[in-house]
């Protein structure tokens, strides 16, 4: 089965995160109808990471707006299910990729995306 553009973009985002020192703990984790692309440890912080992929259609990067309630539901469910995780800060990141051409894209990492415009 051939990988889609989104699949390739998510692999690229995962590589970026790992190079930045993130330890990927989960990929495509879901609870009910809520889903998050990655859950990772970033120097002791638990990061819930949503990926946004957009073709270069003249509109630029995908919207960085996040669904606070969905993020919080996911975090609560994950922490409840994984009680062995030590106390740590939790944050919500958005990583956006703008596809420019086959194999080329721009990446933007918005750390702690819920802290802006709350």
Name these PLM-found stretches:
Residues 38-58, 71:
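Conserved catalytic cores of phosphodiester-cleaving nucleases, focusing on short active-site segments
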Residues 19-46:
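Active-site metal-binding core of divalent-cation-utilizing nuclease and nuclease-like domains
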Residues 55-77:
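Mg2+/Mn2+-dependent nuclease catalytic core
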Residues 10, 37, 50, 93:
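Acidic active-site catalytic centers that drive phospho-/nucleotidyl reactions
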Residues 1-28:
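Acidic-basic catalytic patches of nuclease active cores, encompassing PD-(D/E)XK
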Residues 29, 51-53, 112:
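Active-site donor-binding loop signature of nucleotide-sugar glycosyltransferases
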Residues 82-118:
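Domain-level recognition of nuclease-like catalytic cores that cleave nucleotide substrates
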Residues 25-26, 81-83:
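Short helix-to-loop capping/linker segments positioned immediately adjacent to catalytic or ligand/cofactor-binding
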